[in-house]
């Protein structure tokens, strides 16, 4: 399973990084994107995934900040 860790990534870099990651690794589904505890980072990632019509699962509770992409 491929993983993208966004710790230390600036908000303005997220869009391009996430889009490149999901399209370059679409054969490796499921994909994991680690956003950390930032609600803003989670929203930025979800915006990209929604725009690309990707299906994903959001982590809840202790898994908050982890998004698993299940279809692109």
Task: Give the predicted meaning of each segment.
Residues 1-72:
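Long, charged, low-complexity intrinsically disordered regions
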């Amino acid at each position: 399973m491929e993983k993208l860790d966004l710790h230390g990534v600036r908000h303005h870099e997220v869009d391009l990084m996430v889009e490149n990651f999901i399209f370059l690794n679409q054969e490796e589904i499921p994909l994991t994107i680690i956003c950390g505890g930032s609600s803003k980072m989670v929203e930025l990632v979800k915006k990209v995934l929604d725009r690309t019509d990707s299906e994903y699962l959001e982590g809840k509770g202790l898994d908050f900040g982890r998004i698993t992409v299940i279809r692109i």
